[in-house]
C-alpha cells in the first residue's frame, strides 16, 4: 500500500479514486493532482513507481488535507460559536444553520425523537 499524507492508499484502485481516501481530496482535486504530477489517473496504485509516488506526495503537500484540514474546520466552527452569531448559535444548539425548516424534518441534526412527557391529571 502506498502511503501519502499519512493515509494508506488502496493498491487495487486507480490513482484518481485512491487519492480520494485522503480527507480533503475529492475526485476533481485528485484528477488535477494527477495531471500536475504527470501521473496517469487511470493507472492502478500498485503499478506506480517510487518516483510517481514522490511526485504525488509533493502535489498533495501543496493542499491543506487530513489533520490540518479537520483542525481548521473545527476552529472555524468554534470561532462562529464564540462570536455568538446566528450560525454559531445554531451549531451550539445542534440545529440546521442554513435556513432549513425545523418544525418537521431536520432529524439528522436534531437526533432521534424524544418521548413526549405524559400530562399528569
From Swiss-Prot:
<dbReference type="InterPro" id="IPR018269">
    <property type="entry name" value="Ribosomal_uS13_CS"/>
</dbReference>
<comment type="subunit">
    <text>Part of the 30S ribosomal subunit. Forms a loose heterodimer with protein S19. Forms two bridges to the 50S subunit in the 70S ribosome.</text>
</comment>
<dbReference type="GO" id="GO:0000049">
    <property type="term" value="F:tRNA binding"/>
</dbReference>
<protein>
    <recommendedName>
        <fullName>Small ribosomal subunit protein uS13</fullName>
    </recommendedName>
</protein>
<feature type="region of interest" description="Disordered">
    <location>
        <begin position="92"/>
        <end position="121"/>
    </location>
</feature>
<dbReference type="GO" id="GO:0006412">
    <property type="term" value="P:translation"/>
</dbReference>
<comment type="function">
    <text>Located at the top of the head of the 30S subunit, it contacts several helices of the 16S rRNA. In the 70S ribosome it contacts the 23S rRNA (bridge B1a) and protein L5 of the 50S subunit (bridge B1b), connecting the 2 subunits; these bridges are implicated in subunit movement. Contacts the tRNAs in the A and P-sites.</text>
</comment>
<dbReference type="InterPro" id="IPR027437">
    <property type="entry name" value="Rbsml_uS13_C"/>
</dbReference>
<keyword id="KW-0699">rRNA-binding</keyword>
<dbReference type="GO" id="GO:0019843">
    <property type="term" value="F:rRNA binding"/>
</dbReference>
<keyword id="KW-0687">Ribonucleoprotein</keyword>
<dbReference type="InterPro" id="IPR010979">
    <property type="entry name" value="Ribosomal_uS13-like_H2TH"/>
</dbReference>
<keyword id="KW-0820">tRNA-binding</keyword>
<keyword id="KW-0689">Ribosomal protein</keyword>
<keyword id="KW-0694">RNA-binding</keyword>
<dbReference type="InterPro" id="IPR001892">
    <property type="entry name" value="Ribosomal_uS13"/>
</dbReference>
<comment type="similarity">
    <text>Belongs to the universal ribosomal protein uS13 family.</text>
</comment>
<dbReference type="GO" id="GO:0003735">
    <property type="term" value="F:structural constituent of ribosome"/>
</dbReference>
<dbReference type="GO" id="GO:0005829">
    <property type="term" value="C:cytosol"/>
</dbReference>
<dbReference type="GO" id="GO:0015935">
    <property type="term" value="C:small ribosomal subunit"/>
</dbReference>
<dbReference type="InterPro" id="IPR019980">
    <property type="entry name" value="Ribosomal_uS13_bac-type"/>
</dbReference>
<dbReference type="Pfam" id="PF00416">
    <property type="entry name" value="Ribosomal_S13"/>
</dbReference>
